[in-house]
Amino acid sequence: MSNPVESASFFEKVPLPAVNAARFPDYHPALTAQAAVVEANRCLFCFDAPCAQACPTHIDVPRFIKKIASENLAGSARTILEANILGASCSRACPVDVLCEGACVLHRYNKQPIEIGRLQRFAMDAFHASGAPLPFDPGVPTGKSVALIGAGPASLACAAELRRAGIRAVLYDARPLPGGLNTYGIAEYKLPLAESLREIDML
């Protein structure tokens, strides 16, 4: 069995090569601050929110978008992270066209659905750029520990929840870097390696 993945700055160890960035530009480019506010204000903030119901992690979509509209980016990111600790990578890799955006009520009126994925990415990118720590305190140490086999998204999310419960998590993986599919299996133009590792570094 390989050594446990220790807490380290993987983002600094493996920078994104410039040639990769040139060859594989973003499939869905990041929104500017102005474009994000304009897009957020298109949202109807539905009470029953079919977009949130279609989200596998049940992010409160209207709430995080409303906070973008009011330029409360920290609050928006917190709303996302409360439901999905891997909200940054999901904002880039999630098939939103068949999930949240596919459920947007604007389809009923032959309108372009709200770009939920890009708005989520905007909020999470702003959160990462701020250098703020995760908005959750670790739980009181219980003295317990759990071994997680594989350091993919499921194990990372589990480790974060365990830490909030005061339980130490040790991740084991056959590969040198954590992240599983996020790090090794998603095309660079959707989820760059450096972005996956930056999110893991934050965790």
Regions found by a protein language model. Give the residues of each.
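Feature captures the FAD/FMN-dependent oxidoreductase FAD-binding
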Residues: 140, 145-149, 197-202
